[in-house]
Curated annotation (Swiss-Prot):
Belongs to the bacterial ribosomal protein bL17 family. It comes from the Bacteria. SUPFAM superfamilies: Prokaryotic ribosomal protein L17. This is Large ribosomal subunit protein bL17. One of its GO terms (cellular component) is cytosolic large ribosomal subunit. One of its GO terms (molecular function) is structural constituent of ribosome. Part of the 50S ribosomal subunit. Contacts protein L32. GO terms for biological process: translation. Keywords: Ribonucleoprotein, Ribosomal protein.
Length: 141
């Protein structure tokens, strides 16, 4: 029996869950709105609210914690990013660095007077293939 166990489980390994949530959180910070399934959005909301609260502290320790939780890679490029940089497109260079900047500069100042509840979940129609409940998770304006 799983009494009082609040672990996020969607049929994946723990490392896959951790990476998936970090990638979804980076996408949410970058785009401020993503479409996903309801269980993933509910778990993502917990992590997003914690990251905004961390960003509002605006200390070096908070930045280092955010880099670790978002699994930001500063010094490595994927092969696709390397090709884009080689071709002269510097906008593709380290998207993760811009995510940390946006989190601490834009979102933290936007929510500086708010004490929680930084995201909203809007339910959509179910997905056609597997009838999964879809939703949109977004930051409040």
């Amino acid at each position: 029996m799983q009494h009082a166990r609040k672990k996020f489980r969607v049929g994946r390994t723990s490392s896959h869950n951790r990476c998936m949530l970090a990638n979804m959180l980076k996408s949410l910070i970058h785009n401020e709105r993503i479409e996903t399934t309801l269980p993933k959005a509910k778990e993502l909301r917990r992590h997003a609210d914690k990251m905004i609260t961390l960003a509002k502290k605006n200390t070096l320790a908070a930045r280092r914690l955010a880099v670790g939780r978002l699994m930001v890679r500063y010094n490595t490029l994927t092969s696709k990013e390397a090709r884009q940089v080689k071709a002269g497109d510097l906008s593709a260079y380290n998207v993760d660095r811009r995510v940390i900047g946006k989190l601490f500069d834009v979102l933290a100042t936007r929510f500086s007077s708010r004490n929680g509840g930084y995201t909203r979940i809007l339910k959509l129609q179910n997905r056609v293939g597997d009838n999964a409940q879809k939703c949109i998770i977004e930051f409040l304006a």
